[in-house]
Amino acid sequence: MKTMIAWLVLLTFAAALCFADEGLKQEHMNERKKSRFREDIPDEISEDLLLQEMEAMEAELLEKEMRMEENRNSREKRCLGEDISCGEKPGDLVRMPCCAKYECKETAGYWWYQKRFCVKKKSG
């Protein structure tokens, strides 16, 4: 019975401490809010500052969006990938270029196929 009472006292103490800690956290948050939005600055000035910050953020986002759109429009439209005949001989009908990371070369099977193929550029 004595141990049950001791455990109940300990549980009550822990619960009270927890609620007291939550109250301190709430007070701390209120103090931070007050310090962040000082009352000595008039409302009009704080609204103007907020408006300027939002306009700057909007301009930055619009600039990023324009750059993304330029990148989308400037990408390669049609090109040939790896191991596709690129046909750079004058008599060939297919004249599409290889993609940027490939080059048109005579591969090991050139003697048989008589065609060039797009292969990866060597990075060395």
Curated annotation (Swiss-Prot):
The presence of a 'disulfide through disulfide knot' structurally defines this protein as a knottin. GO terms for cellular component: extracellular region. It is found in: Secreted. Disulfide bonds join 79-99, 86-104, 98-118. It holds the Pfam family Toxin_22. Its main location: secreted. Expressed by the venom gland. Belongs to the neurotoxin 14 (magi-1) family. 04 (ICK-6) subfamily. InterPro entries: Toxin_22. This is U12-barytoxin-Tl1a. Residues 21-78 form a propeptide. Residues 1-20 form the signal peptide. Ion channel inhibitor. One of its GO terms (molecular function) is toxin activity. Keywords: Cleavage on pair of basic residues, Disulfide bond, Ion channel impairing toxin, Knottin, Secreted, Signal, Toxin.
